[in-house]
């Protein structure tokens, strides 16, 4: 089965919506960029699944960023995405990390920043502390603060595959909290191995075979990095020309590497002259 897909579903007998995401190739492309320790491989998988699930709730075209920061050995873990379910991510850390490290062990006094940037309209940013035992619980707290709608998440990753499930009450005149609690209890019986090996139809049948579930068409999830030679040139142009020329004189070239995908962009003296002489970077040789 395709291992990089997201499904939305609705319960016809309750105002509750759900999502299920299963990732493999796109997850591996994120991990391939750096030699991440096992605990960060799992964290990035959970964060990637969470970002995909969050992205599927957006009602606009635009971008999303889910960023974890702190003063611990892991200074940053971030997944960026858009409404097309195109994701990329990276983490930065210092020293050795134990396989069973908690969020607090990794980030110290940490927090999560979720930034929504519509193609049209105002940007929204929400911040919650990383003071819960799991990433899923921290994302649930974000929804409690921002949308005030009961929300539940389940996130799994093992370094090879990542997956997640999402439930949320729909705005309604009626009280469906009891339905939500019932469906949450059913969903809580899911096992990571089931999400890694079963397709969406079988997962939903396994969990909700006594419920009326409407499953919508799958949405492909993919890895997509937004780096380019032009963007790298634009970054060089923001630096002092004398500083760039000093590096060029010493190294013979300027190299710009992308930590998201490992792409490497090299600029020689002619390129640098063009960058600073021309406001349009599109003329830089490829």
Swiss-Prot record:
MF terms in GO: protein folding chaperone; unfolded protein binding
A GO biological-process term: protein refolding
Subcellular locations according to the entry: Cytoplasm
Predominant cellular place of this UniProt entry's protein: cytoplasm
Disulphide connectivity of cysteines: 225-227, 258-261
Entries under InterPro entries matching the protein: Heat_shock_Hsp33, Heat_shock_Hsp33_C, Heat_shock_Hsp33_N, Hsp33_helix_hairpin_bin_dom_sf
Keywords: Chaperone, Cytoplasm, Disulfide bond, Redox-active center, Zinc
GO cellular component: cytoplasm
PTMs per UniProt: Under oxidizing conditions two disulfide bonds are formed involving the reactive cysteines. Under reducing conditions zinc is bound to the reactive cysteines and the protein is inactive.
Lineage: superkingdom: Bacteria
Recorded family membership: Belongs to the HSP33 family.
Main function: Redox regulated molecular chaperone. Protects both thermally unfolding and oxidatively damaged proteins from irreversible aggregation. Plays an important role in the bacterial defense system toward oxidative stress.
Protein name: 33 kDa chaperonin
Gene that produces this protein: hslO
